[in-house]
């Protein structure tokens, strides 16, 4: 199991800032564990003027995709065969797969770690972002992933983000993927939730403080190894309400 993921929300106490990442190791899991534990923190430190050099194993490497949400802006960076795909009014807008990666010291003459980075404003028709490893994208197209996840993510009563991730993982596995699969869903638009019988709008900035991420990883034989479900505001608040009953 060489896939790893990470999430940091409420950066510096600001609910409008968050960073997410999916990392895929090759030639050993340590190369994925290192950026998963350090890269997002290093990005945050770099933003505030601090520098910290990553220490990684000379053997092995990792591809990764990260998404930083800050004050209505979205910064997506990709190095390797992970991918970020955004649903824009139901249309898939995806990042490029670039021949880059972290580690792989023996290949540094040919493989660089500098990611491909895109910066955009989060608009009203930007619905959600899918971060996933190549275990998904080798078997599922960008538009197909959006089409499958969208009904789960745009439900009025409560988004079923974990179910959407599981659906995507199951589909890739059913098509013969023997690789590790990691999928993360990040809601970007206001979500309407029902609380005490009243429909309320929850903006994406507030959602960052409530909704973290969903990631599912599977082993090579297709069995679920672990999943982190801290889905969306509807998902969490529904469980808070259930606990109160």
From Swiss-Prot:
Q: Which residues form the PPM-type phosphatase domain?
A: 1-188
An example of a Pfam family matching this protein is PP2C
Superkingdom of this protein's organism? Eukaryota
> Do you know which InterPro entries this protein is assigned to?
PP2C, PPM-type-like_dom_sf, PPM-type_phosphatase-like_dom
The family database entries (CDD domains) matched by this protein are listed as: PP2Cc (cd00143)
GO molecular-function term, one example from the UniProt record: protein serine/threonine phosphatase activity
Q: Which family does it belong to?
A: Belongs to the PP2C family.
> What is the name of the protein in this document?
Putative protein phosphatase 2C-like protein 45
């Amino acid at each position: 199991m060489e896939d790893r993921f990470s999430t940091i929300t409420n950066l510096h106490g600001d609910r409008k800032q968050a960073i997410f990442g999916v990392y895929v190791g090759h030639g050993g899991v340590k190369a994925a564990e290192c950026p998963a534990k350090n890269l997002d923190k290093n990005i945050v430190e770099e933003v505030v003027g601090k520098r910290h050099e990553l220490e990684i194993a000379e053997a092995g490497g990792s591809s990764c995709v990260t998404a930083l949400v800050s004050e209505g802006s979205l910064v997506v960076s990709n190095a390797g065969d992970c991918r970020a795909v955004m649903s824009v009014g139901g249309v898939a807008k995806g990042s490029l797969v670039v021949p880059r990666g972290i580690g792989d010291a023996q290949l540094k003459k040919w493989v660089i770690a500098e990611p491909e980075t895109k910066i955009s404003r989060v608009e009203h028709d930007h619905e959600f972002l899918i971060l996933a490893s190549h275990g998904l994208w080798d078997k599922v197209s960008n538009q197909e992933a959006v089409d499958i996840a969208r009904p789960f993510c745009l439900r009025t009563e409560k988004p079923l983000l974990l179910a959407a991730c599981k659906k995507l993982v199951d589909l890739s596995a059913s098509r013969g993927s023997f690789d590790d699969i990691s999928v993360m869903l990040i809601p970007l638009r206001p979500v309407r939730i029902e609380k005490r019988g009243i429909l309320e709008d929850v903006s994406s900035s507030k959602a960052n403080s409530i909704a973290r991420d969903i990631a599912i990883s599977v082993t090579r034989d297709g069995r679920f190894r672990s999943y982190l479900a801290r889905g969306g505001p509807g998902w969490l608040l529904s469980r808070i309400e259930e606990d109160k009953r």
